[in-house]
Amino acid sequence: MSATAQTLRPPSRTLMFLEGRAIHELGAFLGALPLLSLAPKGDGHPVLVLPGLVASDTSTRPLRSFLGSRGYAVSGWRQGRNLGLRDGVQHAMVDLVRELSDTSGRKISLVGWSLGGLYARQLAKMMPDRVRSVITLGSPFAGNPKATNAWRVYEMASGRRADEEDGRFGGSLSETPPVPTTAIFSRTDGICAWQGCMEKPSARSENVEVESSHCGMGHHPAVAYAVADRLAQPEGKWAPFDRSGWRSMVYPDPAR
């Protein structure tokens, strides 16, 4: 971990208190559905959506429903609340990736919100032959594990230290998965330090910035569009997100 990553601090109390805007972002998502219907349609490949800390498939239902309307075979993670890597959780996710891939005969895409994004990255490292792409939403994979306002909740829920990495689950969190990877982040995230949610740009990895809360990222209209856009790319023909035209007014330059 770099010196910069080690010194990252959690978001300010002001940003944390502003997380209440997530409910308004859900309203904006519902209101934007007619416009979101213009998002690219997919090719029907399986998409597994993984929830954040202490959240369940209920939290990802709006995004999964939207992606289903775009033509994808969407699945939740089917394990109730995400309480961290408790006994059996890792094996259940691996089994589900195998099931979705074997049933469809295709590689699957992984979309993970917050802690779910960490799982998505590690699963892709373990099973690159079954994973087509990875998209993370506000997932703190690159910074100090305690540069969040949720690390104590994680330790209580999981029974594990926040800085404890399991080498048997994909190795280093900050290492980029060997598949096309998009990290969606927000500088106004009130839970995770945004700097720790950014990927190292490369020929197959990128960052997409949105203006969103952390708790509303899974149902923010700009996030939903970006996820649909990324998933719609033909397999083997990945290209970075296009911010030209109207998109430049919605998606800030992540490198600024």
For every predicted segment, state its role.
Residues 1-47, 65, 70, 103, ...:
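Flexible, membrane-associating and regulatory peripheral segments of lipid-active enzymes
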Residues 15-22, 46-54, 179-187:
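Short, mixed-charge, low-aromatic patches
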Residues 27-30, 57, 231, 235:
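Short amphipathic alpha-helical segments enriched in hydrophobics
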Residues 38-39, 64-65, 95, 198-199:
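Short, flexible segments with low predicted structural confidence
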Residues 45-51, 56-58, 62, 68-179:
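Serine-dependent carboxylesterase/thioesterase catalytic core
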Residues 62-63, 227:
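Amphipathic alpha-helical segments
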Residues 125-126, 131-256:
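Helical cap/lid subdomain of alpha/beta-hydrolase-fold lipid enzymes
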